[in-house]
Amino acid sequence: MRSGVIAQKVGMTRVYNDAGEHVPVTVLRMDGCQVVATRTVEKNGYTAVQLGAGQAKVKNTSKAMRGNFAVANVEPKAKLAEFRVSEDNLLEIGTELKADHFAAGQLVDVTGTTIGKGFAGAMKRHGFGGLRATHGVSVSHRSHGSTGSRQDPGKVFKNKKMAGHMGQTRVTTQNLEVVSTDEDRGLILIKGAVPGSKGAWIIVRDAVKSAAK
């Protein structure tokens, strides 16, 4: 098990394959992705690497974090993430990961925070059909209807699909294909959509279920 990477979402475009078919891709850019710290079994009880990416202003970095970056001899990072790795894949502090960490055709799992939509109704949030447009229905055309309870059990069960805050949740999309990489510009092109807005930080790992596919 090896480390993943931290990348920033640039946006979407399309590329053409050898058959002349266009493939929609999401462009991810790697910006100074370095190993900031390591975790070992002897000291921490598990093996992992902590990566940092992007650039943070020194004045916006806490004194404790400035000390950590100074020990690692790296510039302050805007985003940190920890990856569990096997002992033989433990990287040295200061090691920089490039876009060629992944290969074209490889499957990856991508984690990001979805775009927030605010407070949304049941029709938009869960795809409910709503009530009738006429025949006695007034005001409640887009309501979710009954919450499905009576004297017993006398409550609404948890996780009942209702109106509420939509989006802005941490989501992992599995088994996305790496179309190509550009080491010089630090770009990774991934087939399909990736959760998050433009400029969002994205975690990219080797797919864990690719063997089943």
Curated annotation (Swiss-Prot):
PANTHER family the UniProt entry points to: 50S RIBOSOMAL PROTEIN L3, LARGE RIBOSOMAL SUBUNIT PROTEIN UL3C
Give all N5-methylglutamine modified positions: Q151
List keywords of the entry alphabetically. Methylation, Ribonucleoprotein, Ribosomal protein, RNA-binding, rRNA-binding
The protein's name is: Large ribosomal subunit protein uL3
A cellular component term, taken from the record's GO annotations: cytosolic large ribosomal subunit
What gene makes this protein? rplC
User: Could you tell me the Gene Ontology terms of the biological process aspect for this record?
Assistant: translation
Annotated Pfam families: Ribosomal_L3
MF terms (GO), sorted A to Z: rRNA binding; structural constituent of ribosome
By sequence similarity, the record places it as follows: Belongs to the universal ribosomal protein uL3 family.
The lineage, from the top, is: Bacteria, Pseudomonadati, Pseudomonadota, Alphaproteobacteria, Hyphomicrobiales
| Subunit-level organization | Part of the 50S ribosomal subunit. Forms a cluster with proteins L14 and L19.
Recount the PTM note. Methylated by PrmB.
Q: Which Gene3D superfamilies match?
A: 3.30.160.810, Translation factors
Function text: One of the primary rRNA binding proteins, it binds directly near the 3'-end of the 23S rRNA, where it nucleates assembly of the 50S subunit.
